[in-house]
Amino acid sequence: MSGDSNAFGMTQREGTKWDDGCDHDDVTKIYVVGGKYYIQFIKIDYVKSGQPKNGSFHGDSNGGYMLMFEINNLKNEYLESVEGYCNPGRCINAIQFKTNFRVSDMMGYTTGDKFKLASHRKKIIGFQGSADNALKDLDAYFTSITPTRMEAQGGKGGKEWDDGADNDSVTKIQVRINTKGIQYIKLNYVDKDGHPGKEQIHGSETGPGNKLEPFEINHIDKEYLLSIDGYYDEVSGVIKALQFKTNIKTSEVMGDVEKGTKFTLECTGHEIIGFHGFAQDNLNSLGAYITNLPLTKLEYKGCGGNIWDDGTFQGVKKVCVYFNDLIRCIEFEYINGGKEETRVHGMKIFMDDVSKKEFVLDYPNEYLTAVEGTYINPYGYTKITSLTFKTSRNRTSLRMGNASNSSFLLESKGCALVGFHGLSTTDHLYALGAYSFPMTPLPGVKKLDTQAGDGGVPQDDCGSHGV
């Protein structure tokens, strides 16, 4: 059942109770029909034992709008949480779904008490609730998401150790070096309840050596450990050097890389939450446990027009803006599976007083990190008047449009903007929001040491890479 303290659980007395069960692999499709005041019915389709399973209808339809939210399980997408608004004892007024890749529109009307069904690092595999002429309440079944184990890389020898994967994040890493290489690695974690875990040391603390400055990771500020570069000696079987990268910074190279074979632990879209490996007098090899990184929806500020949502992509390649006194049209060129995909919102107006400006990024060596905008608010509707774009290379576009007094900012520290959503009509852009996702710093950006390694975005395959 839901593990969130704000969950709107089985508290209603009215309506017929229903239960889809908890023996599914995943949720695949959700159909919602809404009326003037509340959600009328919901239907959920699942995958069970690898086969599609059609769900039952819960509630009653008396006309109204129908929306469908599809989850692509074949691409490792899964349902993380459900949020919405309700009138306790009566009905659910609005509902919204979030996966590990994207967030649906809010379906319905945002009146009443807010509720949330979520459980940290778990996914939804089933629902239950009650309904008659309306959906009256909703609760969810959760199952844990098993972290992926990346096999240990480095030299041979030593005794096996394993810190496990039952952690929320890595918070501090410190190494001691001697003439052979890494003498020990000291690791600090935060558990799933947010409490500091026991410090773990692997290797030897005896004999001469030099303890280096620790590398600290601020998990409270949404900093995540994303990748590790290591170098080992094939003869001695000892790791010679290590370097760590988060979505915000890169450590100095800890050790000697002059005579070592390189390996990398990383996986696109994942963070490292635990370690295992082999060690005795020195650190011989290092492996990791990884889990999915969080996707954040940066909400738009404003109202008017029609809702649109591009979803998420690998990155943004180009932005084109058409404007005069207002932003008339915005065009995004995204990268999806290595191919370019274009989305246009508004109409490309070619008139004497309409200007066009474009901003091109050097993808995959550069990504979009922030959008600043200004807007006016005539007659209760917002209209965007200017936009400015910033990148991971510390480049800023020219202002596109004419600045006004009210402003907004779409930005999340250490993250790239990988998709957009908003409000528009054929002749105005009313509001703009974005999706943000943690990304590895690129070469030359926020380095702590000029001798840092190759940098760049992580590899596409989830595994260990030897060079």
Task: Show the residue positions of the predicted features.
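Lectin-type carbohydrate-recognition ectodomains
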Residues: M1-V467
